[in-house]
Amino acid sequence: MTKKQENETSKELGMDNKKTSGKSGKLKISVSAIRKGEKKTEGKRSNTRRRANNHSNDHSKRRRPAAQDLLKDLKQKQRADEARLDQESKAAKQEYKKSLNKAEASESKPVVKKVESVEKPAETAAEAPKVRGPKILKPSPARLKQNQANSEKPAAKPSSSRRPSSRPSFTEAPMPENKEGRRRKSGKPGRKGQNSYADQGRGANSNRSEQRKRKNKKHQSAPQVKKQVTQRKDRPLPESFEYEVGMNAQDLGKILHREPAEIVKKLFMLGIMINQNLSLDKDTIELLAADYGIEAVEKVHEDISDIDNIFAQEMEESKNSENQVVRPPVVTIMGHVDHGKTTLLDRLRHTRVSEHEAGGITQNIGAYQVRINDRLITFLDTPGHAAFSSMRARGAEITDIVVLIVAADDGVMPQTIEAIDHAKSAGVPIIVAINKMDRPGANPAHVTEQLMQYELIPENYGGSTIFVNISAKTGMGIDELLENIILEADMLELKADPKQKAIGTVVEARLSRGKGPVADVLIQQGTLRVGDPIVVGDTFGRVRTMTNDKGHQVKKATPSMPVEITGLNDVPESADKLVVFADEKTARAVGEARAQQSLQKQRENVQHVTLDNLFDTMKRESMKSVDIVLKADVQGSAEALAQSFQKIDVEGVRVNIIHSGVGAINESDVTLASASNALIIGFNVRPTATAKSQAAQEGVDIRLYSIIYKAIDDVKAAMQGMLEPTYEEKVIGNLTVRETWKVSKIGTIAGAFVDNGYVTRESGIRVIRDGVVKYDGKVASLRRFKDDVKEVKAGFDCGLTIENFNDIKEGDELEAYEMQEVKPS
């Protein structure tokens, strides 16, 4: 074997110098010496590094002043030691090469025994686990041939189970043994924590890596048992299921007892591409249910914020309740203004309410209960003025019977017709009371004929409408009217369930300084108690106090009973529905949700400028407007005033209601009016002391009214005052030119005679020649003889000049005129 082959063989097999005979013993000694030198060198290096690190760490902890100098000296000493050890290592390598050459020269054919490694049975690729570690090289063809040749010889004792190192062969000398025959770790004996491969330059974690390797080998040898995954048993499909729009495959999988992947696959087969988290629409869910052969029912959520729906459900439930009892009828008195509605109510209640009303007219809805013998009747008094149309409509909606008051001496009037229409639209029976029969000019037959034109036919004429002649002032016919009201109520069979949750309707609402938001409510079903959590329109709260129509506080309100309640967070609107909830938390959530919905509707109602309404918008913006901050005592009056102001028709001017509310005029109202240059109108309210002084300082005009038509007239006058003044030409005199003079620096002077009327120094003048207007201008100067005069009347001569005109001739006619302002109608 050549030297080159021997070197290759020794590198591949890792020479076992223990079994080499002859001079190879010297080779073993020299290799061991080299290894000892290297270990010693490596140990010194590691000790030097350790000492340097420990010294550096201790020095940094103690913060000695000369730490940097000591560290520098240690580094220099370490570099010197490393250089010396490198020289010793090179010398040892050279000595080893020389001894190897001598051994080859002395023996013509060195005996090299193959060291066979203990090979484990081959594992299949499927069984062999993946272990992180060094890459194992595939043996070369030369090594395979050598393995076959040596397999015939007796096997040598394996040196190690470690894989051959790729380092030079001189490092493959056997490890030194201790007295017990065990291999001891490299490095200094007795030192703990030294790496077993420190001489090969491995890191501090090599022990851990070796432990992992041994562990992995154990796992390789042990048979691997795969864990069996428990298969999910498919439960049977339900016959039907409830779904919500927006559910995904995971949600449906839980309901249908199927994997989401199966849902996705089935929809894919149906031509619908989805993933597990995609929200599904109604059609997709129903298509999936049809494919499975089951029924899909959409789940309907009840909107608790829809109190109108709750109100209707409660009313329907009360009709089928077993706890129904007879309730008092609700009677609304309607008619034209000054026909005696409130006077009739005063007669029934034995009060004098009409004497205390401003202007003698009712301007809000009043609710009262009157006991007739052993029966209670609830009366609603509605305004008769044209401005209170919405109030009359609300009164007709919550009533059971309408008593239509018509004055016998006045007959059917516009508000009478309107009241008839409201009652018919609400489907409420009408009882006609022809009032003021004590007047000399009373003519009930004429009134009956008028009402028959509106399909109100009396019973004696074959109709079904009850007619009663009364006098609210003297009390004539009042008992007959009450008997007919009770008879009509018995025919209607009015009942209610007092044990259910209360529902009602707001008759009026206002803001009281001492009580806060106050609402007059008519209870229609159930019983309202103090402390009940309620929602009223867009407001919510808990009933704090309840006061009846006589001013007494009560603990509960039964059906058909009008009460004044407090405890709301804001002033509700008239005709808002009242609903009682189980707890205050739910009531608050519903009230806040409704307030948010109302705000959203207001935003949606804002009209945006488009090409279609651009012209109307420009026209509206070019119009002048009267800005008003409106405050009233009750919500119904504020609503009626706002509607009346909007109906005022003055060409070129419109009313802009900046803010409308209830309660006293406060500082915020004055600040708002000052910022927007608006007028404050108060109806049955007064400004606070601070608001009054602030308005005086900022020059804000506050107008206070107690009669609605006076407020309407003043606003109309203000609108007319904002119009540009219009002028009309008026001829005031005629003159004839008798003589002319031309004067330098002055021009032509006309001597004229005033035929009729008069001429002034500020009047306009026209020069007419042969029936044609030659010039239209102004009088420049007017004199009589040598005196300047302001006016010359008919029958007198005068001299005058015309501005910028000198072509005046004898015989010309002069026409004097002036522009007069025309007041808007």
Swiss-Prot record:
<feature type="compositionally biased region" description="Low complexity">
    <location>
        <begin position="158"/>
        <end position="169"/>
    </location>
</feature>
<dbReference type="GO" id="GO:0005525">
    <property type="term" value="F:GTP binding"/>
</dbReference>
<dbReference type="Pfam" id="PF11987">
    <property type="entry name" value="IF-2"/>
</dbReference>
<feature type="region of interest" description="G5">
    <location>
        <begin position="471"/>
        <end position="473"/>
    </location>
</feature>
<keyword id="KW-0396">Initiation factor</keyword>
<dbReference type="InterPro" id="IPR005225">
    <property type="entry name" value="Small_GTP-bd"/>
</dbReference>
<dbReference type="GO" id="GO:0003743">
    <property type="term" value="F:translation initiation factor activity"/>
</dbReference>
<feature type="compositionally biased region" description="Basic and acidic residues">
    <location>
        <begin position="1"/>
        <end position="19"/>
    </location>
</feature>
<dbReference type="GO" id="GO:0003924">
    <property type="term" value="F:GTPase activity"/>
</dbReference>
<keyword id="KW-0963">Cytoplasm</keyword>
<feature type="compositionally biased region" description="Basic and acidic residues">
    <location>
        <begin position="70"/>
        <end position="98"/>
    </location>
</feature>
<feature type="binding site">
    <location>
        <begin position="381"/>
        <end position="385"/>
    </location>
    <ligand>
        <name>GTP</name>
    </ligand>
</feature>
<keyword id="KW-0342">GTP-binding</keyword>
<feature type="region of interest" description="G1">
    <location>
        <begin position="335"/>
        <end position="342"/>
    </location>
</feature>
<feature type="binding site">
    <location>
        <begin position="335"/>
        <end position="342"/>
    </location>
    <ligand>
        <name>GTP</name>
    </ligand>
</feature>
<feature type="region of interest" description="Disordered">
    <location>
        <begin position="1"/>
        <end position="239"/>
    </location>
</feature>
<dbReference type="Pfam" id="PF04760">
    <property type="entry name" value="IF2_N"/>
</dbReference>
<dbReference type="Pfam" id="PF22042">
    <property type="entry name" value="EF-G_D2"/>
</dbReference>
<dbReference type="InterPro" id="IPR044145">
    <property type="entry name" value="IF2_II"/>
</dbReference>
<feature type="compositionally biased region" description="Basic residues">
    <location>
        <begin position="211"/>
        <end position="220"/>
    </location>
</feature>
<feature type="region of interest" description="G3">
    <location>
        <begin position="381"/>
        <end position="384"/>
    </location>
</feature>
<feature type="compositionally biased region" description="Polar residues">
    <location>
        <begin position="194"/>
        <end position="208"/>
    </location>
</feature>
<feature type="region of interest" description="G2">
    <location>
        <begin position="360"/>
        <end position="364"/>
    </location>
</feature>
<feature type="binding site">
    <location>
        <begin position="435"/>
        <end position="438"/>
    </location>
    <ligand>
        <name>GTP</name>
    </ligand>
</feature>
<protein>
    <recommendedName>
        <fullName>Translation initiation factor IF-2</fullName>
    </recommendedName>
</protein>
<comment type="similarity">
    <text>Belongs to the TRAFAC class translation factor GTPase superfamily. Classic translation factor GTPase family. IF-2 subfamily.</text>
</comment>
<dbReference type="GO" id="GO:0005829">
    <property type="term" value="C:cytosol"/>
</dbReference>
<dbReference type="InterPro" id="IPR000795">
    <property type="entry name" value="T_Tr_GTP-bd_dom"/>
</dbReference>
<feature type="domain" description="tr-type G">
    <location>
        <begin position="326"/>
        <end position="495"/>
    </location>
</feature>
<dbReference type="InterPro" id="IPR000178">
    <property type="entry name" value="TF_IF2_bacterial-like"/>
</dbReference>
<dbReference type="InterPro" id="IPR027417">
    <property type="entry name" value="P-loop_NTPase"/>
</dbReference>
<feature type="region of interest" description="G4">
    <location>
        <begin position="435"/>
        <end position="438"/>
    </location>
</feature>
<feature type="compositionally biased region" description="Basic residues">
    <location>
        <begin position="181"/>
        <end position="191"/>
    </location>
</feature>
<dbReference type="InterPro" id="IPR009000">
    <property type="entry name" value="Transl_B-barrel_sf"/>
</dbReference>
<dbReference type="InterPro" id="IPR015760">
    <property type="entry name" value="TIF_IF2"/>
</dbReference>
<dbReference type="InterPro" id="IPR006847">
    <property type="entry name" value="IF2_N"/>
</dbReference>
<feature type="compositionally biased region" description="Basic and acidic residues">
    <location>
        <begin position="35"/>
        <end position="45"/>
    </location>
</feature>
<keyword id="KW-0547">Nucleotide-binding</keyword>
<feature type="compositionally biased region" description="Basic and acidic residues">
    <location>
        <begin position="113"/>
        <end position="122"/>
    </location>
</feature>
<dbReference type="InterPro" id="IPR053905">
    <property type="entry name" value="EF-G-like_DII"/>
</dbReference>
<dbReference type="InterPro" id="IPR023115">
    <property type="entry name" value="TIF_IF2_dom3"/>
</dbReference>
<comment type="function">
    <text>One of the essential components for the initiation of protein synthesis. Protects formylmethionyl-tRNA from spontaneous hydrolysis and promotes its binding to the 30S ribosomal subunits. Also involved in the hydrolysis of GTP during the formation of the 70S ribosomal complex.</text>
</comment>
